[in-house]
Amino acid sequence: FNTLFSSLNNLGVKVLESIALVLELPKNFFEEKVIRGNSTLRLLHYPPIESDSNVLRARAHADINLITLLVGAEEGGLEVQNKDDEWIPIKPNSKSIVCNIGDMMQLITEGNLKSTPHRVVEYSANDSKSRYSMPFFLHPSPDVVLKSVYNEDDKGVLAHDFLEERVKAIKLY
């Protein structure tokens, strides 16, 4: 577990380096912010569905963190919402990793990078199988101030407070 977690964290830092360069920030802009982050690795199991087709296995939502790395699933069902509000299926590939932008990244980029709404559906109960997903949620350290990368006067919000507010809003506690 520790090796996998460390590898995904290192990959996440590399993705953040690329994002920083696209945003015309120093390459290591995010590194200090995530070095002691609250990142989480989860294993999700979606059991087979026995009812009608088009069942939602996970309702539409966006992730709270900076970025999420979704380690390749072998079963389909993941869909992302595009800017026209259409749901686009992501073709499963066990050798790929999908990267979603989270709400914290959307906040600090003032919406220039949009948080990715996504859901998990079951297309056909006749062929339903268990689906496993392994998301790595890359979070900054709780004491990091999330503020605009474009506006130096932005007071921002503590990552801990932002996370707590969102978790309460979606009734996770």
For each feature predicted by the language model, list its residue ranges:
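C-terminal flanking tails of non-heme Fe-dependent oxygenases
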Residues: 1-173
